[in-house]
Every structure is written in C-alpha cells, then in structure tokens.
Amino acid sequence: MSSFGNNAGGGGREYHDDRSNRDHRHGNGGSDAGQRRREDHNSSYQSYRRPDGRQDSYGGGHQGNHGNSYGRREDDRSHSRDNHGGSRYGERDDRGNNGRSADNRYSQSNYNYDSNRGGQHYQRDNHGSKDDRGPMNQYNDHGSNHNSNSRNDQYRQGSYQGDGHSGYRRDDDRRRNDNDQARPYQSNRDSDRNSPRDHHNYNSQSSPRSHQGGQDRYSAPKEDNQRRYDNHQGGHDSYRGQNSGGYSGNNSGEYRNDYRSQQDSRDHRSGGNNSSSGFKNDGGFGGNDNRGFGNNGGGSFGNPNNSYRGNSNNIGGFHRSDGSNSEGVNAPVRAPRDWVPVTRDIDELVRETADRLADCDVGQDRAVEIRNAEKDVRLTSWTNSGLHPTILETLKRIKYNNVRTIQGAMIPQVLDGHDVLGQAETSAGKTAAFGLPIIDKILRMDEETRNKARQDDGPLALILAPTRELAAQIHEALRTYCQNTDIIVLLSYGQSDRARSLNEIRNGCDILIGTCGRIMDFTVKSHISLLHLRFLVFDEADRLLQDMKKDPLGHLGAIIKDAGFMESAATRQTIMTSATFNASVMTVANELMKRLPGQDEMIKIVLANGRLSKRVNLEFFECKGLAEKNAKLREILKQNVNGKTLKTIIFVQKKDQCDACAAKLTSGGMLAQTLHGDRSQDMREKLINDFKSNRVNLLVTTDLLSRGIDVSDLDRVINFDLPDGDPDQGADTFIHRAGRTGRTGRKENGLCVSFVDPQSDRDSLLAPKLVELIISQNLPDLKVPDFLDAMAKSSRGKSGTSGFGQRGGYGGRGGGFGGTGRGRGGGVFGGGGRGGDFGGSGNFGGSGGGGSFGGSGGGGGFGGVKPSGFGGSRNNAEPTSSGGGFGAPKAPTGFPSDNNDASEDAPAAGGFGFSTKAAQDAKKAEESATLGSSTFGTANNADEEPTETGADGNDDDEW
C-alpha cells in the first residue's frame, strides 16, 4: 500500500499496490515540498472495500464491523491529522512492521505517521491484542514499532509542517509564547472543498498536541496551548476514548460535544451521526439527540484533554498513584488561560435572594450554644443588631426579614472584635453570619486605613473556601450585601485569568475571596500584601483542611508565615465556620485564634443537638452490589412528578464512576450530566448554571459538590455510594451531601436517598453513624431500617465500644480495639492515656490505659488484666476497668464466653476487647453531651492517616 499527498491542496496522485480494492485518498501535508510517500503506516485518510463488500475508512471513519459508523466530517481535509472518529472496531492494516491482525477489536488507531524526516516515524502501537486498549508508546523511533525510546513524558512533538515533524519541545507554560492560529475547521464541507488547502496556518510551532492526529482546533488568540484540543476522539493523539472517542453502545456511534463557552468554540466530534442511543454531551451526557458522550470538560470516554503527559505505561488509561487504572479517564482539563468567570448582574442576584428568603422558616434552625464568651448576647431582629444603616436597607431590599439562629449568636461576637469558631447545620446562613459584620466594620473604618491597604495591593478581608464553586457562591452573596456601598469584593481562584485578577486587586480590593492555591501563589510571589489584613475567614474549614492532618499549618505556611500576615496578627480577627470540625481545624484554630482573658479556648458557637438540617428527610435502601444499585436508581428516577424528572444530584465516590453512571442513565433515555474535578472550570460553572436554570435535571458528581452549591429548588439527593473515610469523616460528608437539598426557601422538605450495601466494609463501618443521624433528626415518621440497624450492631461488635473509634483509632474513646481510658485517645490500636509503645507496663498492654493493643487494666498481653498473654483471668476477680484487645477479664482463655447477664460490671463485647457495661454507658452518656463528632479540642485520631483524596481521585483538591 502506498499513498502520496500533494502539498498545499494541489492535484494529488493516487497509487495502488496489488490490493486493487484499496482506494487511497489524497493527503495534504501543508508544505510545498512535493510528494511524500507513506509506506507501511496508513497515515492518510484511506478507505478500502473489503472482500466481503464492506467498506473500511481509515483516518476518517469506519463502516464495517457491527454496522457502526464512526464518520468524520468530510471536508476533504484528507490529511490524516483531522482524526474524527478513528475506528476502534475497524479492520487494521498494519503492514510492514505491524502486519495484519485478525483480532482488531481493541486497536487504538490506524493512523501511523511516517515522517521520513530525521529517520523517525510516529506511530501508535497497533500490535494491540484484544486487551491492548491504548498505545504502549506514543512516539517510537523509525526502526521499531515497539517500546523503543518511548517519549511518554512531558515532551511533545512540535509542528506538523508539510511531511515532517519538528523537534521535541516542552509541553509547559512556554507554549503560550507560540503564535498558534490553527484553523478551527468550522467551515462546511462545500465551502471548504472550494477553498485552497492552505495549511500554512499551522505555524512553525503549531500545537504541540495536534500533530498526533487531530487538527489544532481551538487555538483562539491568547489561548494557552494547553487548552488547544485537537480531540476528535479518534484515539490518535494518545488515548482519546476507546471506541471512536467515546463510550459506545451497540450499533450506535456518534459522540459529539459542542459545549461552548464565551471564549472558545468547541466542536468535539467523533463518530457518525446515526446513533440510536448516543449520549448528548453539551458538556456531559444527553438523551436521544444522537449527539455525544464527548465530555468536553473532562472525565472519561472522550476527554478533550490530549494524552496523558508525563505518564508512562499508558495502556488504556492513565495509572493513578493509588495503583488503579482509570481505563480511559483523562487527566484534568484546564479552562482557557484568559477565561474569566461570568459576573452576574446585581439586580439578578437581589431578585434571586429575595425569592429564596421569602419563605424562610427560622423555626427549623438548630439551636446553638455560645461557649467561652464574656456574654451570651443574641440578636432577635435586625433593628437591634447595630449593623450599619446601609446594610439594614439592603436586608430589607432582599427581604431578609428574620435573623437566623447562627447569625443571632455570631454577629454580636464578631462586631465586638472576637475570634469565633462557628458551627451550624447546612443552609443555616453562615455566610451572612460572618459577612455582614465584616462589611459593617469596613464601612466604619477611616479612609486612611482603607487607602493604605489599597496602595499596598492588600485586602482588608480574606475569605478562603475549599472549592471554587463555594468561593463563587460567597462572592455573589457578599456582592449582594455590599450593594450601595463603596466596598469592592473580588474573586480569584485557579484557572481564572490570573493577570486580570491581579489588575483588579491593584485597582482596589477590600474583600478578597478565593481558594488556597491561588491566594498562596499571590502571597509567595508578593503580588498581594497581607500587612493590612483585618479579617481572615476559613469557610467550611474542615473540608479546607481535611487532607492536611499531618501538618495543616505547614500547608498554610505561604500565608501564615508571610511577614505582613504575622505583623497584622494583633489587629486581625480570625473566623472559622463549618457544619463540622476535625483535629486539623483545631490545630489551625489554636495557632491563629485569640482567646479571651481567663479562657483556655477561643469562643465557640456550637450546635446544641443534631447536625443535620430538619428540612431534610432521609430514606435508605439496601442494595447488594452495583447491579442492584443501578436497578434501584432507575426505579427511583422513573418516578416522575407530573411527567417531570425531579431535580436530583447523584453522588458517587470517584470521578471515573460519574461517566459510567451517567452513561447507564442516558442509555435509558434520561438526560444526565456529569461534574467532577477533571472538568475545566469554565465547564463546571456552565454546568452548574444549567442545573440551576433547569436546563439539566440530573447531575452526577463527586464530593466536589457536597458543599458550596446552593440550589434552592433541589428536590433530591441520591447517595449512589456512601461517603468514604473513617466513620466520623464519612458522617460529616453525609451531612453535607444531604444538606444540598432542603435549602432555605423551600416550602417542602428535601429528600436524601442513600443506597447501603451490607457487603461493603465501608458501608458497614458507617452504619452506626447513620443510625445516630436518623435518631438525632427526631422525626416521628423516620425510623431506623431493620437492615441498617443490624449492620450497625454488627459493626459495633467488631470495632470496639463505639464502632471504629470515636476518639482513638479503631476503638472507643479509650482507643484501639476497645478501651475506655480517656486522656490522649491513644494511637491506632491504642488505649486511652499516654501509654507507651505497645503498652505502658505490660506486653502489648499498658497500665493506666496503655498504648497499642492495650486496655486500661493491669496491663496483660494484648490488653488483658492478667500480666500474661491474651488476657487470662485474674483469679476470677471482678474487672475494674475495660480489657484490652484479645482479652476478656473473666474468660480464662482470653476470649469471651457467652454471657447474657447485663450486670453493670459484666464485660461487654467489643472489638477484640471487652469493656464493662457501666463503662460503656458512661462513655455513651459522655458522647451524647458532645457535638456528635470529634470536634472542638477533644482528642481525635491522633495517628490517623490522611485520606489523600486528591491522589486517589475520590475528591477534588482545590489547592
């Protein structure tokens, strides 16, 4: 086989070898170098008629196996760089080095480039056997098609100019200096056919990503090449979707994504247009519009992000650090470098806020307590709040008629200049609780103070949020409260235009809202000054610091070690708010927050009881395995109201599960979209706006949206997967997920539906916490399901007196595997008290609440009360305290005998250790007086390992 391309659109010639059935199209190399022979590697657009009469199309589509059509837009740009829908199922003709493969179902592509320049050809490893789902080596030297000098790293080939490739170039920010004005292929077929084939608009360094198979489609002016997606899902530039660029159902094949932003035009096509059940993906998934699963914003099945740079052994998807294989999930996608978040008109925000607050029932707010304060003062109305008159006028305009519970408790403390830790349930009004007093105090500042801050490019207030979505929501809320004032509120976070943000700050900024990564970057590079900072707010502080258990202060070092920040400590107020708190929050709080004279702790405003909003109803379904979950999900979603699908957020645990779940829904005719951290920020915001405006009613997401998205008319939340992590963390995440519904302004309660798998260790460990939440709701119609109650009892029996550790790892308050000592809380497997390594005084058991594997009795082996292994009896003496792991005080063998007596001193079964019933009751009573989670200074998981949510793909790290 051979094919010649006539450059620059000239009249190409056609050559045929002995296979007369093969018809070769002309290739347009884009240079004047004349003809180029492509031997052995089928790089031009080709079609040939097979002996069975079916026609195969290489490079631009395939009509063959299964009758699928993965067509390209035939604009006669017949060079092979425009890979619309390379065949996954297509017959491969890998000649020369590759040979012909009979089993071609999983071939990545047939587009094997032979450069003939510099002795290199760049070809996909098409030796793939049945399981070869992606290229082994993206760039191989000419002499070998296997594993020779693979360049699966950050270096990409440069321009495709004519019949060759330029030298390697770095795939980093230096690409922004290139003037890439690649033609975006927007013209129609007829006009394009009549136009000259001028491919000189591929400049000398055009698109470090496009030469591998797709034209550099999006190189809009000033756009970072990193966003220049040539992704037509042909599988040509690395592993773009497995079948023709996307997830394919039987005999369907069109995957298109033309989710567009204002800044760029994306038309990610792949495949034909005859799909019977394709996924409409205007940024996600769709129903029966025969459009695609193209997933422009990121995620699996046709992510427009080109290849997996810096990732070796890229076989069928990138391997994450946790060892799992994403099977086609692409790396995160960035927004264009000059992308700017949409700023909504203030009048629109006022109308929206007024509508939401009109039916607000403050009577459903949870009660809170004020601790460590000089006085317990609470607002009962805005008129006696002492807030600036301009603020009061604004509150009237937006119909904020009633003071919420958390606001009534927090605002007076902030106005008095105190540092405050504030806790409230979701949708309780925490943003106004810290925002209104900050605005009030800035309005009352003298002009000199404000001018100095502006001259030094420094904000007076800095508000940090864990996610960009939450930061954007806070920004809109504070803009609403600041209307008719001269206070400037700005927003800056990752993927938004950095230079523009800096220019805005330099023009004056009173309140700066952002995520940690962007703000720390500004601080380290001295782009902003923290010298004049008067207010520092950590909103959703537990989520903000949840991955920083080992050294939360170290991760914030760029801010808290800044010279200006340290100098402003005396005059700065620090405020932290969240529905829950953890040890990392307390570490930062103890370092940064001031206490009142005579107090050991800072002022805390805490929930008196219950942490879940009363506006949320709970439902639980037992689902054994993935198949039952999918069946139950379809059953629930088909229960429409008046023929309309209820607005629903579906939570899954990992990013790559989003697409699979949405695919199943879409194949059933339900329009679903996905949103997770691999989507570019512009797409994330576009999807959220579509969801809020009812253009989308089903949204499949990760815990990225468990906080910070306020959709007042959200009907339902479905926990397809229960949250991950230890039980306390899982319960906290569950509360935040459930809190997305039942928002302020809803006339009816929201609904949180959860699928619980009794075969899952994660679900079993979380079961006791879920039972606690159900009981804490204190709703007459809400009962604990029998299956969940059984799971909770079983879990408690396996994991100590309080199920996997309220204070100590793997155990009760006394620590691991059942111990009731208090003190430090022990290490993992450890009892209460300080203890020693593997016990303070005995083998594997410490006296006075030993360490690992230790109880708090006499310190026997593995925590028994006799100083011998496995906790034998001690002359049948009554136990004085709980036994440790593997030790029952009254069991001669060291293991428990059946004992149905419920005496106060009888040993009660615990996880590999036994505690007296009296001790358990005392512990239970003590815990009921706490906040329901490891909060506010109690010892909590001192040796708990970080969850690494950013690494394993479970969540989305905004650092």
UniProtKB/Swiss-Prot annotation:
Q: Which domain of life is it from?
A: Eukaryota
Enumerate the catalysed reactions.
ATP + H2O = ADP + phosphate + H(+)
Q: Which gene encodes it?
A: rde-12
Q: What is an example of a GO molecular function annotated in this UniProt entry? A: mRNA binding
Q: Residue ranges of the Helicase ATP-binding domain?
A: 411-599
Which named protein is this? DEAD-box ATP-dependent RNA helicase rde-12
State where composition is biased (Acidic residues): 942-959
Please name the source species. Answer: Caenorhabditis elegans
The record's principal subcellular location, in a coarse class, is cytoplasm
